[in-house]
Amino acid sequence: MCKVQYEMTPEEAFKEVIKVKAFVKGGVTISGGEPMLQPDFVASLFKLCKDTGMHTAVDTSGFILNDKVREALKYTDLVLLDIKHINPEKYRILTGKPLKPTLKFIEYLKDINKPIWIRYVLVPGYSDDEADLHNWAKFVSGLKNVERVDILPFHQMGMQKWKELNQEYKLSEVNPPTAELISKTTEIFRSYGLKV
């Protein structure tokens, strides 16, 4: 259960964005949780941003694709997308969800040629198998709308959130990846022509 501090309409959020627009070079990125659980909000806020020439990005798992999400994507310049694993069984172990919806989302982004930055969470013992890394890189290298890949080394900073939610944190014993593992993963991804 989330503790909502306050709620904002897209118009109220846009007023906050405008206050800092002169001080930042980038645009607006909506992340979460999962922003596409509120696609009407994303579409409305991004439309306001686009009307003033601001760049828009959404950070998503790509698990949800429906007409409202497609509408939100019309006003989205860039999608930051997590593909946590390419093996469906291992993806389910890592996320608790099936991979297929995310693959459908990726296919849609490919069809509309929407620019993507892919995020790969490197979790020792879960997403660091060399054969899986090659399969992942081979898949991603076939997506011509992928502009770059970011390797996100696993960390334990989210552990407290799980405690507050009274949920079991299955990765509590996992250590962050070593510099060597990050370097090896980077080399594998680059060997497929990916910009890392």
Please annotate each region the language model reported.
Residues 1-7:
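Canonical Radical SAM [4Fe-4S] cluster-binding loop centered on the CxxxCxxC motif
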Residues 11-157, 161-164:
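Conserved AdoMet/S-adenosylmethionine-binding subsite of the radical SAM
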Residues 191-196:
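Radical SAM enzyme core and accessory elements
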